[in-house]
């Protein structure tokens, strides 16, 4: 699992567009846990693709992007509080 955090400058119209594109890219790989924070369950190939896509979107002079690798098992390394608990991607999903 990885944790993605970003800060995109939204002072211009182009910055606001970048922000939407970065968020949409992250949503394709995981779940939003805060406004600019995503948890993503990805393998190494997906990680490389996601990183490439994000680096194409952000402006390295105006924005910041951080990617953290989270040590498994998550149930021992994560505590959650509040009304928006994480989705367990490993368990069965009933639709």
Identify what each model region corresponds to.
Residues 1-33, 37, 41, 45-46:
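Extended, hydrophobic alpha-helical segments
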Residues 58-95:
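C-terminal structural segments of small proteins and small subunits
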Residues 14, 50, 78:
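A short acidic (Asp/Glu
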Residues 34-64, 69-71:
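Short, intrinsically disordered low-complexity segments
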């Amino acid at each position: 699992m990885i944790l993605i955090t970003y800060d995109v400058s939204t002072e211009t119209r182009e910055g606001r567009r970048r922000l939407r594109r970065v968020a949409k890219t992250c949503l394709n790989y995981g779940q939003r846990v805060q406004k600019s924070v995503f948890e993503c369950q990805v393998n190494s190939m997906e990680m490389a693709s996601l990183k490439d896509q994000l680096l194409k979107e952000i402006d390295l002079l105006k924005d910041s992007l951080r990617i953290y690798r989270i040590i498994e098992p998550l149930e021992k390394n994560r505590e959650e509080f509040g009304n928006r608990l994480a989705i367990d991607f490993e368990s069965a999903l009933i639709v």
